[in-house]
Amino acid sequence: MIDLKYGDIKESLPKRILDKFCRNAFRDATLYPKNYDTLISRLAKKHNVRQENIVLTNGVDEGIDLIARVFGKDILLFAPTYYEFLDAPRRNNLKYEMIDCFDENGYSIKYREDDVKNKSLIFLCNPNNPFGLLNKEEIIGIANKTKGIVAVDETYIDFNGESVINEFESVPNLLILRSFSKGYSLAGLRIGYIAGKAGLIEKIRQRKLVCNVSSVSVNAAMIALDEGKYFRNLINKIKKRKDGFEGFLRQEGFGIIHTHTNDIIIKFKNLADADKFCSFLGSKKVIVNQGNGISTCGLDKTFVRFACGTEKQMKDVERIVKKYNPGY
């Protein structure tokens, strides 16, 4: 089976990094977490901000949920986007509005000033999940037009895009969510963080659990920071592999929507064609998402989305796709 449903990094960590985890990440496993400040200090130094500007979260999902609960009286989303942006207000019985930003010309943020002016919270992804890319000026422009908070999920920032993590001093209603899931391949350890003005971060800190992240995850994150060169090279390899596979699909006649993440997206002309393709892949034990799948909102079932896997996985999928006949 080739499971490409989830957008995590498919490569296993190299032995030398795993050995570091075994020696160091688990050393405090018997103790309640006491190492938050050490990681926060390192992140503050990395981003050239103060420690009071950062709070650790149990992955980006907890960060989204916390921000929604603290600031989300009236939330605005731009679809298609990450499903948790929709799930958090639904789960917490919060008011929300979703604007569709995809048409025949592609993805672009579309709004009237009245759409954003009085919202208490606006969620953005940059790069967007599943596709689309905002420039810094667009994000700051939205932040300057609203009285509320603009929370920017930068989970995929290592794949592409221009971060706004150093803009919150001049744009005080910005909150930036980061994750170790994609840029550092630690999706299974559920560790992320939020950066922003100290006053906003303190409001979030007051609502989170005291021990919301395990000491194992914190120690692993610090090891990952030490191995930044390895992870940067890995992301570049994945980007190159994904772009190559997109090129292959175009040559085979598929309609491709280029992404700025590790996702590959095919847009079919009709539902029947998408159904046939997914049925064919399923018969070959290749698992993909049709429509929203498990992590997206705003896609209909003419979209087929899957992660860029390992080099071997993608070569195997390429061989399988070459055998596809639309009359299957």
Q: Which role does the model predict for each range below?
A:
Residues 50-54, 154, 172-173:
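Short acidic capping loops at alpha-helix termini that bridge into adjacent secondary structure
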Residues 44-66, 78:
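Short loop-beta-helix segment that forms the pyridoxal 5′-phosphate
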Residues 5, 196, 265-271, 285-328:
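Conserved PLP-binding active-site segment of the aspartate aminotransferase-like
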Residues 69-124:
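PLP-dependent aminotransferase-like
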Residues 1-31, 118, 328:
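N-terminal "arm"/small-domain region of PLP-dependent enzymes with the aminotransferase-like
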Residues 12-14, 35-37, 173-250, 254-257:
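PLP-dependent aminotransferase class I/II
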Residues 102-158:
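Active-site phosphate-binding strand-loop segment of PLP-dependent enzymes
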Residues 252-284:
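Conserved PLP-binding catalytic core of the aspartate aminotransferase-like
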